[in-house]
């Protein structure tokens, strides 16, 4: 006969496996791969349209990252986590992400991309994507995969 702890472990394993088939999570994985491809293309050709493509793919990744994390937290029983900041703060509290300040900076950068009119800001965000944000996305995927 199964005890309570064994049933809980089986239940959590099912929730995690079910989450891995979640469309947000699947699309987040794909979007991060596309972001890496765009960064490689920029490194290879160095043209500004490639940089713009990196920034656009970053926008997709950011949306899918917080929505995937939200779905994971909902599957864990959380409610009232409807904004990107709230989701990522809860993810930090649950040790899903390690650096909440970096994620808040990432979300701020994402908001700036909606109003990008100057080359300097675009360049700064591009460098952050390449040097920091891509790593955050990859770490999140690894953590959510369990």
Q: What does each model-found stretch correspond to?
A:
Residues 2-146:
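Solvent-exposed interaction patches of small proteins and small membrane subunits
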